[in-house]
């Protein structure tokens, strides 16, 4: 089964490393959506010999992503991760949710 993946914070260190791991491990990606802040929108990131354009986090429909890797900071995680989780599985890297008992 191939999976639609979104990466929030795709141009930062954690986002770039996530892209690298997905490629190196040959993760079965169907569509890769790269999302970031407005300052990074329009940039291109290479994944499996294709240039993928970075899109706006604010404008993305997370129903398109089966899994979302949230590679942005705690402030954004607090606001965005719960919204995204309504439509996509969220794997969140910041420290914001670490002390929450009901987070798995």
What are the language-model segments listed below?
Residues 1-104:
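N-terminal Rossmann-like NAD(P) cofactor-binding subdomain of oxidoreductases
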């Amino acid at each position: 089964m191939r999976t639609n993946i979104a990466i929030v914070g795709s141009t930062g260190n954690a986002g770039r490393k996530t892209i690298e791991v997905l490629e190196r491990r040959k993760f079965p990606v169907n569509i890769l959506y790269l999302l970031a802040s407005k300052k990074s929108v329009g940039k291109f990131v290479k994944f499996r010999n294709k240039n993928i354009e970075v899109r706006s986090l604010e404008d993305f429909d997370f129903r398109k992503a089966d899994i979302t890797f949230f590679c942005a900071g705690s402030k954004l995680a607090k606001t965005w991760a719960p919204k995204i989780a309504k439509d996509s599985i969220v794997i969140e890297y910041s420290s914001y949710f670490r002390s929450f008992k009901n987070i798995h």
